Amino acid sequence: MNILIFGGSGKMGAAVAWDLVKQADVESVGLVGRNEDSLKKTANWVNSSKIRLHTLDIMDVEASKALMEAYDVGVSTLPDRRTSYRVVDTAIQAGLDIVDMLEEYHRRPDPYEVEGLEKPEGMSLNEYGDWLHEEALAKNVTFLDGIGFAPGISNITVGEGIRKLDQADCAVARVGGIPSKEAADRHPLRYMITWAFDHVLREYMIRLNVIKDGKIVEVDASSECEGFKFTKFGQNEVLECAITPGMPSFLYTRPELQEFAEKTVRWPGHWEGIKTLKEIGMLDLEPVEIQGIKIAPRDFLLAVIEPKLQPLEGDTDVCVMWNTVTGTKDGKKHRIDYYLWDEADTELGISSMARVTGFSAAIGALFIGRGKITKKGIVPPEDAFDSELYEDFLDELELRNISILEEITPLG
């Protein structure tokens, strides 16, 4: 098969490419980006004769369509909603099966901070999402939507937990990419950039939907902070998590849930710092005037803080997950927990975030190309990886030294 990666010069795109070129049934891997030098840098690092470089502005729809005709599956690793939607829209029109790792659920785009997302004139966001789904069905396209770490692994494990129960009542996903403990102490907010930080701040600020008492309700991001101790995989760390706009597909694909939320994991102190920044207005987008110059407080903050959050020499990251599903099985209450603790591959120079995100997207593309995932339209991970494919997915993760621990506990 031939697989085309959009955003091929970024860290996530590079990780996807590194994984794909090692598969015997992958003949070529195309890298798409606007900067030829950046693409060459990725190609040199991947170091495979299977790599093909394509310098292209993805906003050029006709050129993108023409390129897509030479490939079997596409992977979007782009860092914002404007480019993400453009690529998947174009792929659907071109009849190309596509995997996207950024957006949580294209069929129901959240209305906050749309990041330049362009939709057909006269359509609401929800109408656009439904239109994309119907177009994909009409074009016989599989659009695997939100496949990485979170969304992605988190959706797949929570979906499996729900399937294992006769009746699932509550699901909480706790996921996040954090610096190693040593690196956290060297950075403000005990945080280090492993993902597009402007997009991270967006997810701290918007309002989002969760399920409470069986109803969809809107809450503030960064709320309901919860502390916990992570003791699996030989760890013994105190962490915190707060609600963020992750995995909203469950509001629609698993409406039987009485409670549902996704929370982002951070080191203690991070969420208190974010709360302070929110309270003083530093994360606002409304411009303020400073010495005759208008600038959004968040843009100013990004300019100041991003350099201080970049990894220093020797810094590594960790990805952590603790997902919980509760409900009944054979008339008795049960809790099912899923755990992950993944560290960076320092030998290869691949961050943990790139491993769990990029490798998951690569597996998704491979499963489509191999005919394992056949559902058409917009397909969220919890539906794409059903009971049969769930074990196959875990096996593929294990081949990449990523382990998921499942624990089932009767409750009384």
Residue ranges of each PLM-predicted region?
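N-terminal Rossmann NAD(P)H-binding glycine-rich loop of SDR-like oxidoreductase domains
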Residues: 5-19
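Short beta-strand element of Class I
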Residues: 28-30
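Helix N-cap at the beta1-alpha1 junction of Rossmann-like dinucleotide-binding domains, i.e.
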Residues: 35-37
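Short, conserved SAM-binding/catalytic segment
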Residues: 42-51
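Conserved Rossmann-fold cofactor-binding substructure of NAD(P)-dependent oxidoreductases
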Residues: 55-73
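Rossmann-fold NAD(P) dinucleotide-binding segment
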Residues: 66-70, 82-103
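Rossmann-fold NAD(P)-binding glycine/threonine-rich loop
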Residues: 101-141
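C-terminal catalytic/substrate-binding lobe primarily of soluble NAD(P)-dependent oxidoreductases
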Residues: 163-412
